[in-house]
């Protein structure tokens, strides 16, 4: 039985957020919505600029990271951050349409969020 990719990502218990090369959020699964509501009291993120979900001081790093992905100098990025009740590991992976940078998928692996 084949499961299409959208249904697979929709049902992951890992927050999954995709953005285009201009930082616009193009996909967020249910767990992603729950995490952003719990951590940032943020809702309706689809179509918004993902940099709004990050601290202002990290936006320069995001700009640099996306540029490195465009130039294919990096194939992923990750970091660990404190969240209420524990830690979360955030993993960013670029994706391409042929040779052209098409965006980033971000996975948030939680150690304690419910």
What would you call each of these model-derived segments?
Residues 11-13, 86-89:
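Short, small/polar residue-rich loop motifs at catalytic or cofactor-binding pockets
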Residues 41-57:
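PAS-family sensory/regulatory domains
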Residues 73, 78-88, 96, 102-103:
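Per-ARNT-Sim (PAS) sensory domains and their PAS-associated C-terminal
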Residues 56-76:
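Soluble sensory domains of the PAS superfamily and closely related sensory modules
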Residues 1-30, 37:
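Sensory modules in modular signal-transduction proteins
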């Amino acid at each position: 039985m084949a499961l299409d990719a959208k249904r697979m990502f929709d049902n992951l218990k890992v927050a999954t957020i995709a953005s285009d090369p201009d930082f616009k959020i193009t996909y967020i699964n249910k767990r992603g919505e729950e995490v952003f509501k719990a951590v940032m009291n943020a809702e309706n993120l689809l179509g918004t600029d993902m940099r709004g979900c990050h601290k202002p001081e990290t936006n320069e790093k995001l700009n640099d990271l996306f540029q490195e992905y465009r130039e294919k100098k990096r194939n992923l990025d990750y970091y660990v951050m404190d969240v209420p009740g524990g830690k979360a590991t955030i993993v960013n992976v670029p994706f391409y349409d042929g040779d052209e940078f098409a965006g980033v998928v971000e996975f948030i692996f939680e150690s304690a969020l419910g």
